Amino acid sequence: MAKEIKFSDSARNKLFNGVQQLFDAVKVTMGPRGRNVLIQKSYGAPVITKDGVSVAKEVDLTNPIENMGAQLVKDVASKTADEAGDGTTTATVLAYGVFKEGLRNVISGANPIEIKRGMDKTVNAIVNELNKSSKKIARKDEIIQVATISANSDKKIGELIANAMEKVGSDGVITVEEAKGINDELTVVEGMQFDRGYISPYFVTDTNKMIAKLENPYILITDKKVSSIKDILPILEEIMKTGRPLLIIADDVDGEALTTLVVNKMRGVFNVVAVKAPEFGDKRKQVLEDIAILTGGSFVTDDLGISFDKVTLQDLGQAESVVIDKDNSTIVKGKGLESQIKERISKIKTAIEMTDSDYDKDSLRNRLAKLNKGVAVIKVGAVSEVELKEKKDRVDDALSATKAAIEEGIVIGGGAALVHVSKRINVNTLNLIGDEKIGYQIVMSAIMSPISQIVSNAGFDKGVVINEILKATNPHLGFNAATGKYVDMFQTGIIDPVKVTRIALQNAVSVSSMLLTTEAVIYDVKDDKEDSVPAMPNMGMGGMM
């Protein structure tokens, strides 16, 4: 496919057109009085949403250069949501504001490289001021406020998230799933749960619920396969003397070993359940070590030189109870030493800090929660599939934003924090030279964009509102767009996570700087020649007999 190139202002103007179209689609969702956007889907009913992330994801323009501009900002906005859980619309609005003012100055002859340096210095100063004005949160009512705002003012979602965090802690694992009915639910799985069920249904102790429950069991933890009953017969005989049940967690239990265990279970000779070990490879070894530490047992593995014939009762884990169904096993109140469990938790926390992989971080956090307070599951219900998807997206965003608020603190919301910060930053203290000062002016103008959009969407005069906040002596004064009143934002619970505001600003300026310093755009050009098969000539009926 042929390529075409556009240069300098011609290229940047086209990129700006794309960014503007994305901005126009996303901006209407901003604030408590933001509007809905209707999105056509390739299949099924259209989706109605007020979620900026969902709107941005659907933007795909026909003009290739305009689409490049839109996609760059869209990617940065999505990255903001991934990192902070919220801020897609804020990042888009800020990026548009910076790019618009920056482009006007570059066209007028300003140096884009110096502008970029000035913008970077200004952003650093703003971030420092945001951190200074932030407030740490810990109380449940504060968590409800943050989660409610991030869920587009849905207080029920805010309360669900706060309740989940109360159960498992702010660093605990909270998952969001679709409920089977229309009601929202919160369930907490206490103890260590992993996604492996009983190997044979003959291990079931409750045929009505189809579960196997073991009270005060011993637990054999190994990454080996158990095929011969002779391998584990010595330890089985020791356990039988105690009269206590046994849970076997192994790579697999099959053949003669499985048959013998099932027969003895059915005859009432010995209460035992066998399950396959969770995960695979090195991750399996790590999880089995977690289970061993949680239950006070030893991990029976060739890597440590431990064979079945050397296993004693002291090598077996113990727990208050174990519940196993066809899909999951849950170990409740393992009897491991508290000091060893804390040491294991500390090592996992260190591993989380050391890794750059989001996948590995999630996996480690999951292990951490299972060793700590368990896993909370928020089940989201709705009347229709369309409503369910939109609601689930809001819960996911609110959950991430709430964790961000706990991590870095909060500032007053509604875009007012950036207005107050602007009063405390002086161009003369930033040591700017040349066109760097233009970069400062661009950013200082752009940070008024979020509050301007929120106020405009609510039908009020943005200029009047901004001037009132700039004149205010109360550093917490802002504008409640839902009621049209000036209020103390902290007292009324209108707050934003610092992390969301910070990352939205940093990402917006980063992508705008990149677009402003773009001097050429290379894009595909469709061939004018049609590749379709030519039409058959009109044969008529002549010559037919």
From Swiss-Prot:
It is found in: Cytoplasm. One of its GO terms (cellular component) is cytoplasm. ATP binds at residues 29-32, 50, 86-90, 414, 480-482, 496. Its EC number is 5.6.1.7. GO terms for molecular function: ATP binding; ATP-dependent protein folding chaperone; isomerase activity; unfolded protein binding. GO terms for biological process: protein refolding. Keywords: ATP-binding, Chaperone, Cytoplasm, Isomerase, Nucleotide-binding. Its main location: cytoplasm. Gene3D superfamilies: GroEL, GroEL-like equatorial domain, TCP-1-like chaperonin intermediate domain. Transmembrane segments: none annotated. CDD domains: GroEL (cd03344). It comes from the Bacteria. It catalyses: ATP + H2O + a folded polypeptide = ADP + phosphate + an unfolded polypeptide. InterPro entries: Chaperonin_Cpn60_CS (IPR018370), Cpn60/GroEL (IPR001844), Cpn60/GroEL/TCP-1 (IPR002423), GroEL-like_apical_dom_sf (IPR027409), GROEL-like_equatorial_sf (IPR027413), TCP-1-like_intermed_sf (IPR027410). Forms a cylinder of 14 subunits composed of two heptameric rings stacked back-to-back. Interacts with the co-chaperonin GroES. Belongs to the chaperonin (HSP60) family. Together with its co-chaperonin GroES, plays an essential role in assisting protein folding. The GroEL-GroES system forms a nano-cage that allows encapsulation of the non-native substrate proteins and provides a physical environment optimized to promote and accelerate protein folding. NCBIfam families: GroEL, PRK00013.1, PRK12849.1, PRK12850.1, PRK12851.1. PANTHER family: 60 KDA HEAT SHOCK PROTEIN, MITOCHONDRIAL (PTHR45633). This is Chaperonin GroEL. It comes from Malacoplasma penetrans (strain HF-2) (Mycoplasma penetrans).
